[in-house]
């Protein structure tokens, strides 16, 4: 089963992935962008180089294609539980050039069965981002991230409607433990 965690930076995805690693010890944990060696290089270029938005979108699509082919598909074949920090949903939300059609091509129509969507309010997002160093995307500001968050939600529910992906929407302001229990229950109801 392919499960993804989605949310803007600061929503608590990394915290939840850490907690899930303790609970699902046999799961394959991965991330987008950067879930492969090639992906790490593409991610570094996309986030740190001064390139056009179109070029950045294609770098992320290339990363996604390689990630699906070399990580996700083999793990699905082995019937592993796969938990990914981000997916095509982020690709579509963060870039105006990353359409569903391009992402379906990059993923060979391999989609997550379950989507965990962590949503955060403006005040908590400001507070959490003030505690970390920001990359090029995060430096675009709180309002931009809140717009991206709305797009994450829109794309997650569009995948649910078009392809039957299950969505669990959570308030990221809740305690990490409370969120973890809800996420684990959502994953375990099939595992």
Swiss-Prot record:
<dbReference type="InterPro" id="IPR018094">
    <property type="entry name" value="Thymidylate_kinase"/>
</dbReference>
<feature type="binding site">
    <location>
        <begin position="7"/>
        <end position="14"/>
    </location>
    <ligand>
        <name>ATP</name>
    </ligand>
</feature>
<keyword id="KW-0418">Kinase</keyword>
<dbReference type="InterPro" id="IPR018095">
    <property type="entry name" value="Thymidylate_kin_CS"/>
</dbReference>
<keyword id="KW-0545">Nucleotide biosynthesis</keyword>
<keyword id="KW-0808">Transferase</keyword>
<keyword id="KW-0067">ATP-binding</keyword>
<dbReference type="GO" id="GO:0006227">
    <property type="term" value="P:dUDP biosynthetic process"/>
</dbReference>
<dbReference type="GO" id="GO:0006233">
    <property type="term" value="P:dTDP biosynthetic process"/>
</dbReference>
<dbReference type="InterPro" id="IPR027417">
    <property type="entry name" value="P-loop_NTPase"/>
</dbReference>
<comment type="function">
    <text>Phosphorylation of dTMP to form dTDP in both de novo and salvage pathways of dTTP synthesis.</text>
</comment>
<dbReference type="GO" id="GO:0005524">
    <property type="term" value="F:ATP binding"/>
</dbReference>
<dbReference type="GO" id="GO:0004798">
    <property type="term" value="F:dTMP kinase activity"/>
</dbReference>
<dbReference type="GO" id="GO:0006235">
    <property type="term" value="P:dTTP biosynthetic process"/>
</dbReference>
<protein>
    <recommendedName>
        <fullName>Thymidylate kinase</fullName>
        <ecNumber>2.7.4.9</ecNumber>
    </recommendedName>
</protein>
<dbReference type="InterPro" id="IPR039430">
    <property type="entry name" value="Thymidylate_kin-like_dom"/>
</dbReference>
<comment type="similarity">
    <text>Belongs to the thymidylate kinase family.</text>
</comment>
<keyword id="KW-0547">Nucleotide-binding</keyword>
<dbReference type="Pfam" id="PF02223">
    <property type="entry name" value="Thymidylate_kin"/>
</dbReference>
<dbReference type="GO" id="GO:0005829">
    <property type="term" value="C:cytosol"/>
</dbReference>
